[in-house]
């Protein structure tokens, strides 16, 4: 059994060459782990659109300017963005070639989404999060090749696929259905220190125990219902392998502090810092770099 896995397909950042490569890979089906679309508009300050001092590659020069121009919020906006993505010839070809199994991440809604909100949602200008979340989910079910698990609740998307006795594929929703607000300590929107300085105070507050207890010890990525569903399915399964399809890295991801600091100074400084770290003793402070991962 062979399948192709995709995630984080940002239209304005480049072409979907990997979809073309998968056409003749021998894959029998495709799995997309989320961020099939991105909600950002065409504002040059938004991720994926702006020129960088190192490459000067822009969405304009690539002919990949998104529509509508605003961050997508309404049902019409989300439908329009899916329609634009589907104009990509490689994506069209892969959908025609093989079946897909998909799950959403945050950008099908808004950056760093959770149950009650998102980093890239402003209720004062974009209305209620619940309303935006509902129309985003509706557009997803309209445009994606998915057998909707529960037509009465479009936000319930986790499900299981059994491939004979070989393996079970458990597709989770670690974003919308049960996630609490994550620790915010990152470079801007998303990891780009040229856009917004690192929020060290917020970051440190989320990592500093008070009387031996971490402030966010009660945070979770799955609801109790979904967790029980997953563990129950795994316990009852008779397949050889259990595979979890989810949106986030299931490992610790640490960066040297000097490398993180150099990132804000451009490619040359970043490369120098990486080289120095790799050639020197491994003694400096490291920090976790992706605070919405399953990194323990």
Could you describe each region identified by the protein language model?
Residues 1-296:
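Metal-dependent phosphoester/phosphodiester hydrolase catalytic core
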């Amino acid at each position: 059994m062979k399948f192709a896995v995709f995630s984080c397909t940002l239209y304005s950042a480049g072409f979907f060459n990997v979809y073309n490569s998968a056409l003749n890979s021998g894959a029998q089906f495709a799995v997309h782990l989320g961020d099939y679309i991105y909600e950002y508009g065409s504002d040059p300050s938004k991720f994926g659109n702006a020129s960088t001092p190192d490459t000067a590659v822009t969405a304009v020069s690539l002919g990949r300017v998104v529509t509508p121009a605003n961050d997508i919020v309404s049902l019409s906006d989300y439908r329009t963005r899916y329609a634009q993505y589907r104009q990509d010839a490689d994506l069209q070809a892969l959908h025609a070639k093989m079946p897909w199994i998909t799950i959403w991440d945050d950008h099908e809604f808004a950056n760093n989404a959770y149950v009650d909100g998102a980093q890239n949602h402003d209720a004062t200008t974009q209305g209620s999060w619940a309303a935006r979340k509902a129309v985003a989910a509706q557009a997803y079910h309209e445009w994606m090749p998915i057998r909707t698990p529960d037509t009465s609740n479009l936000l319930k998307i986790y499900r299981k696929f059994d491939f004979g006795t070989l393996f079970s594929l458990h597709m989770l929703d670690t974003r919308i259905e049960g996630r609490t607000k994550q620790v915010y300590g990152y470079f801007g929107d998303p990891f780009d220190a040229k856009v917004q300085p690192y929020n060290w105070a917020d970051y440190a507050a989320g990592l500093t125990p008070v009387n031996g207890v971490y402030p966010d010890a009660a945070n979770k990525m799955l609801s109790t219902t979904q967790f029980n569903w997953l563990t129950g399915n795994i316990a009852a399964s008779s397949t050889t392998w259990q595979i979890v399809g989810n949106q986030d890295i299931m490992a610790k991801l640490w960066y040297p502090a000097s490398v993180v600091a150099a990132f804000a100074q451009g490619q040359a400084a970043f490369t120098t810092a990486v080289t120095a770290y790799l050639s020197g003793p491994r003694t400096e402070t490291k920090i976790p770099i992706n605070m919405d991962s399953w990194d323990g």
